[in-house]
Amino acid sequence: MKASELNEKSVDELKQELLTQLEAQFKLRMQKSTGQLNQTHLVKQTRRDIARIKTVLRQKAATK
């Protein structure tokens, strides 16, 4: 997910996307710990997506 895509979304949409990504991160961590995760790059990708969403949320909050 690109930052430009996130900038176009509303705060409510960003919060919903953040919850979705946090759930995905939890599931990936559980799969990794049990040895079921084959695509380990998804953990890093999800973590960075969460950081991007949080950054955009903070930027939007600072402009208000």
Curated annotation (Swiss-Prot):
Spell out the InterPro entries in the cross-references.
Ribosomal_protein_uL29, Ribosomal_uL29, Ribosomal_uL29_CS, Ribosomal_uL29_sf
- Cross-referenced Gene3D superfamilies, in alphabetical order? 1.10.287.310
Q: Report the record's Gene Ontology biological process terms.
A: translation
Q: Which residues form a coiled coil?
A: none
- Tell me, what's a Pfam family for it? Ribosomal_L29
Keyword terms? Ribonucleoprotein, Ribosomal protein
Q: Which GO terms describe its molecular function?
A: structural constituent of ribosome
GO cellular component terms, alphabetically, are: cytosolic large ribosomal subunit
Q: Which family does it belong to?
A: Belongs to the universal ribosomal protein uL29 family.
What is the name of this protein?
Answer: Large ribosomal subunit protein uL29
- Source organism of the structure: Teredinibacter turnerae (strain ATCC 39867 / T7901)
The encoding gene? rpmC
